[in-house]
């Protein structure tokens, strides 16, 4: 999480986390391998009683801690040998029984939905309070669809929204709490389902470094294009033929027209371009309604923007932030729950607002592939790079991850933000560095934890009724 308020929420239990397979107990009880700073923690309750909890560690290596010395442990865990297997960056939960019960989560904590996806990736509800009988809730806890088609999720969302309107619901809460992202086409498609006549604007830049400049030249050739077409692991923004302007009206005539560089805050960056070409990316299996000749969902807008609110607990990243920002650009209001116990604004989106994440594995793979193409082309007598340029490429390019003297993350658990995302009104400041407070903030209550649906009632009362937000928290949002 990128901001302190969301990190604070991440410490505590979240019933919504279970829908995406995340740990429901909060990082305070399981810090995923990070030392919390103390051998024990003391919690004091409001009635004055105290409880001390000891910090314990668990081992995620396949063979456990069956090592005779520190050297043997180092050889197994740190050295790049084929016989040993590195720990998974997303390990299973701690082995053994903790001296406490892990909080429940997922469907068992929520009321029965009106309609839901078979794996609960989408759930729809109605509020039953008399004053809120016109409010529907669309819960989207994840876009990470392992083994599921994006169409199946989008179809359930459409069915619920159309049924809600048929049943007289005029207001909609979109609950994105604990949504850490996933399939990006799905996020774009959901936006178009809600606003079918609104175009999607996305703007990104990548750093125009010398190495990226050479890689782009390699991948933009016929040899590079052929390699990309035959390798489905290459998902590159470095092929100028695939890039389009943010409004999708123009393409780039050459690599140089995409690469730039443009100097921004002393850094060389590329020209603005869309996340990708929606027309070519929209398919029957993973559609973006209105693009690529595919229509999905209602042809007219079902809910007015002023009657829609986005709700999060700040734990929203990747595709979640993209969907939320697109909705905000249409005038949809937002509410956030939790954070530190002080009267102040809180950001709606606490996760990454970058344009594209590249793992170290991805970076290594792309560099390796560019190196192969460039070297083979020179060897075949049809060089892409001059002799000096190829020598410079080989000088700049790091070795494969397996070529480092100690093991470097080889499972995609580490990486960097490769592309920055920008707002249409500010093409120079990355969104990652833009403070965007929610329109309203509420603190969690004990009832919200025990009965999560009560948070929807509180959100509806604050945004559609006369209930108050946390003092000093409203009126600080950035107008779309």
Curated annotation (Swiss-Prot):
Pfam families xref list: PDZ_CPAF_rel, Peptidase_S41
BP GO terms, sorted: proteolysis
Membrane-spanning intervals of the chain: none
Pathway membership, UniProt: Mycotoxin biosynthesis
Disruption phenotype: Impairs the production of ustiloxin B and its intermediate ustiloxin F.
Origin superkingdom: Eukaryota
Function: Peptidase S41 family protein; part of the gene cluster that mediates the biosynthesis of the secondary metabolite ustiloxin B, an antimitotic tetrapeptide. First, ustA is processed by the subtilisin-like endoprotease Kex2 that is outside the ustiloxin B gene cluster, at the C-terminal side of Arg-Lys, after transfer to Golgi apparatus through the endoplasmic reticulum (ER). Cleavage by KEX2 generates 16 peptides YAIG-I to YAIG-XVI.
Protein name stated in the entry: Peptidase S41 family protein ustP
Source species of the chain: Aspergillus flavus (strain ATCC 200026 / FGSC A1120 / IAM 13836 / NRRL 3357 / JCM 12722 / SRRC 167)
